[in-house]
A protein has these predicted regions:
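Conserved glycine-rich acetyl-CoA-binding loop
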Residues: 69, 82-96, 117-124, 128
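Short coil/turn segments at alpha/beta junctions that flank glycine-rich nucleotide-binding fingerprints
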Residues: 88, 105-109
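C-terminal "cap" of GNAT-fold acetyltransferases
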Residues: 109-123, 127-154
Length: 154
């Protein structure tokens, strides 16, 4: 199954809003409707629909941190796979594609992500990509980061 990231547009935003999670997962992230609204008012957000062929399977949204004077840093703010398609490797492929898109910005040095500390599935998933926990933020979320070019850190 070939996974692609596509632009969010007039033709797919309604479907994205209604992508289902399992009930216990709904507390782990903001709704897709809220995320899409955010992306219309913050120019740094990049919302992407996750597809296999023509079937919508999920949603991911990341942004450059230019607005916080961290132009070389990106943050993944939303990431979800329709619960009917979880456990099939789709999320792994989609996150890899998002990381590759971010790497295309030659200035990008790091990617951050946050998740609830009580979500061990997220912790293990992101760690498998090389994300390292950096601590809990003021909202009680665990932050993790991956350095894209370790040579820039020296």
């Amino acid at each position: 199954m070939k996974i692609q990231l596509k632009e969010v547009d007039i033709h797919n935003f309604g479907e994205i809003i209604h992508l289902p999670l399992l009930p216990h997962q709904e507390n782990y992230l903001a709704s897709n409707a809220y995320s899409l609204a955010q992306s219309k008012y913050d120019i740094y957000y990049k919302p992407r629909a996750i597809y296999a062929d023509e079937q919508l399977l999920g949603f991911i949204m990341y942004k450059t941190m230019d607005d916080e004077n961290r132009p070389r840093e990106y943050a993944i703010h939303r990431f979800m796979i329709d619960h009917r398609h979880q456990g099939k490797g789709i999320g792994r492929q989609a996150l890899q594609l998002a990381i590759e898109e971010i790497r295309q910005d030659m200035q990008a040095e790091r990617i951050t992500i946050c998740y609830l500390p009580e979500n061990p599935v997220a912790k293990d998933f992101y760690a498998s990509f090389g994300f390292v926990e950096t601590g809990i933020d003021e909202e009680g979320e665990m932050n993790a980061e991956i350095v894209l070019n370790a040579a820039l850190e020296k």
